[in-house]
Amino acid sequence: MKNIFRRSVQIFHKDKKEGDKQDYTGSSGSSGNSGTDRSPTSSLSKKDKKHSKHHQNESYSGDNSPTLSRNHHDEIGHLQYTANHHIATSHHSHSHNHNHNHNHQLTQPIQQQQQTQHVNLASNNYYIRHIYTNNQYDETTQIVMNNGIPFIYNPNARKIFGVPLTQVPCRAGSNVPIIIEKLIDHIERTSLNSEGLFRIPGVDLTINQYIKLFDNGEDVDVSPIEPYTAAGLLKRFFRDLPVFVPQSINKRVVSLFIDEEGKKKPVDMEILSNLRVLVHQLPTVHFEVMQELTNLLGKLMSRSDQNKMTISNIAICLVPTLNCVPAIVTYSIQMHDFFYNEVFPQHHLYYMRPYEEKLVESAPTQPINIMTTSGGEKRYSSRPASITISGLLPSNGQNNSPSSSTITSTTITSPHDSTAPITFTVTTTFSPEQQQQMLQQQQQQQQQQEKQSSSSLSQSQQSIQPISDTNSTKSDRRTFRVDPNLDLTQYIEDTQYNVNRNYLYNGGPSGTTGTTPNGGSLSIGGGNGGNGGSSLSVGSGGGNGGSSLSVGSNTSVGVGGGGGGNNTTDQSKIYRRSVAYTNNEDTKAAIQQIKEKIDRYSKEKKTREEKEREKLLRYSIDLERYKDRTINNKQEKRASRDINKEIEREIEKKRLSPRERLNLFGLSSSSSSVNSTLTRSTANIISTIDGSGGSNRNSKNYGNGSSSSSNRRYSNTINQQLQMQLQQLQIQQQQYQQTQQSQIPLQYQQQQQQQQQQTTTTTTTSSGSNRFSSNRYKPVDLTQSSSNFRYSREIYDDDYYSNNNLMMFGNEQPNQTPISVSSSSAFTRQRSQSCFEPENLVLLQQQYQQYQQQQQQQQQIPFQANPQYSNAVIEQKLDQIRDTINNLHRDNRVSRDYTHYLREVEDLRSSLQKETVVSNEFIKNIELEDKLRREEEKNQRLIEEIHLLETYFILKEKSKAKRLSTTKDLLTRSRSPTLPSSINMSTSSLGSSSSSAYNNNNNNNNVPK
């Protein structure tokens, strides 16, 4: 809201626009004829009439020209229509009204097929001829001619965009322009839920096309326009207006909200009522357009949850376009009923429009049109409000005035239709003791009459019964009810009101009240009682005078000859009287009480709504806090989870040596990668040749783990490179074996071929690019013992791995240990050696031969128990593996906790830094306060010293003056001739002594204290 009021102040620092040259305060009466002059069915101009007379050799023009529809479905029919029209007028010279007789012929399909080509040529030729004859050849016509679109320019059409609002065409009986009605209706039906309406711009090309169509005078269909383009077209219309809100009203509105010093005033009901008065002082057309626009914006704001257009967003988007103070728009939207739905039927109260006269008149017989001094018809043509006070008629004639009545019910109607009157109804009830007695007597008489006339009233029952049913709710207010079977005329004659029957015929004098016994109504008129001319008779009986308005159960208006008299009335309204007052103090007091009650109810409703709004706001704030808390918790959990993953990833990275990482990622040289693959292949050979079940299981687990990890971690390109290197290595091995065939026996060659087949199968499953394929990882089968642990493999050094190969391969004889150790150590040494040296290959072959011999011997020798590798030793080894796994698990937990502790330490450190900064500032503030206090004390002491010095100097001056006066006295006495010399000497001595004493006193006073 601060930005809105800032914008309202900035508007009036700008230069006054050139378009605001009209004085709306005195010329709004001339706009009264806008309902007829600006209608689209207005008469033709002189130029159009002259053009229609010579229509034989010229083109048609004016408002009667056929317009092109925007729908593609009817385009061909309209083209044929225009072409046939021009061909007929150019060759046969028919009248201009001949155009409307061809519609039934254009729908025939045969005629459409025959004339399609001729129609296009005729329409385009006519368009070109029409442009050149009127000298209207611009960019639009060039585009139309290039594209072949038959756009007919109408030079006599009335412009809509960029003209004053009073010149825009409207419908008959309305002051709102047609374009605004169409666009607002389209937006209300289709676009209220569109997000960012009036904020997101539409398509400029489409907006410009529709502007040209509207300015050309065509009946445009706005239903196919998309929401944002329709809103942009409406904004363009308001932006092109010369003046929408006059600057005089804008300045007065700003003065309501901002004082002389430029400060914002607090908004209260007095300011809003003054703003309402200023809004009602707009010209009539501008007022109605503002009412329609704010109604649309209020509906748009009510759906701000979907379209995101709150009151501030609407003000930001539309206030610069409307060029008015934001308060006019914002408060009109938020309090639309307060600003535009009047309690009284008139458009404004009479004091809101001082330049309009005769706004309030006496109640006429028919609705009248309110006229201004300039003769223009205003838009509100309803009779003034009639105020009715109703009640029971008392038994005596003393309480005829409503001054002794009490208000029992009030009715206030405020319809949106301006032509319907608004009625204040104040119902009063008289219930004295005599009245109650009279009612009891009437009930007794009624019971007697029912017994007598039960057979004679069968016909009247059919006519009276429906009337009594319609007003049964009103009859419930009384203390008695009349039987519907009762004969009305007979009952009235038997009542005590027959005494006053002469009032019905004679009546009172002119201007007095006359009581009519028929219906018991009281009428006020300018004639003789109930039968006077131009009188208003309100009640159940109606009136019998000329030009009288009778209001009864069957309300009718009789104009001339007593048309409204002798109404068939309801029994429930027999004892009611209704009086119309124009200037009565009691009626004004009743209206004032009603207004106060309305204000009180509105204030209570406002306070209730404010409490509910505060409650909802409090709940929404709590909800937002809860949402923020949950989002922060989720983010913290996600961050901690990411940190734990990073820690695990780092731990897994540390398990690999740098050389193995290079081999896995393919970053090392070809020799090192081939060397690593060779070592892996040899290890796989040993694992596959071993006949024990445990080693086979280990090899299977090893291969499966490697294949699954390779699919997850490494790309297919690295796998292909490693396979190519393996194939090259196998080819080189085969070539070398061919050279050494003379030294190797045939059995060994067959075994070697089997070995190569096994290596190809195992290496393809492992795929070479395995993160866990090095000798530093030891596969362990812990299916029975360590199933609850997370890790199933352990990190070992090369020496540890080589020493435990015997246990894994199932070697059970002690004499075979040095050979297996040497073979495993030879395998591990292959990491740092080149695989292309023939000596290494020979050593491998020898080691393999020794290993095969050992296996054969093992098969021949029976099983012998080896105490070195018993079950206890194996369990010991398994316990060691479990311990290592537990240690690793503990290390992981410690690392996680450590990161969490580090984070907490960082948070504590940051909070401590903030607290230290705050504490330092607090200490500095305390020091400054102490310093200021000391300075103040010092200044106070200085001020006291200054006061003492001032008093000291004042006393010193006084003493000096006294001393001078005493010396003068002594001198005068010593010089007097009458005194003897002895006395003079004594006085001189006394004077000298006194002067010396005074000097001593002065010296003592000068001594600093």
Swiss-Prot record:
Keywords: Coiled coil, Cytoplasm, GTPase activation. Residues 522-546 have a biased composition (Gly residues). One of its GO terms (molecular function) is GTPase activator activity. Residues 163-351 form the Rho-GAP domain. One of its GO terms (biological process) is sorocarp development. Residues 12-23 have a biased composition (Basic and acidic residues). Gene3D superfamilies: Rho GTPase activation protein. Residues 580-656, 715-743, 839-952 form a coiled coil. The record marks R199 as: Arginine finger. It comes from the Eukaryota. It is found in: Cytoplasm. Its main location: cytoplasm. This is Rho GTPase-activating protein gacT. It comes from Dictyostelium discoideum (Social amoeba). The lineage of its organism: Eukaryota, Amoebozoa, Evosea, Eumycetozoa, Dictyostelia. The gene is gacT.
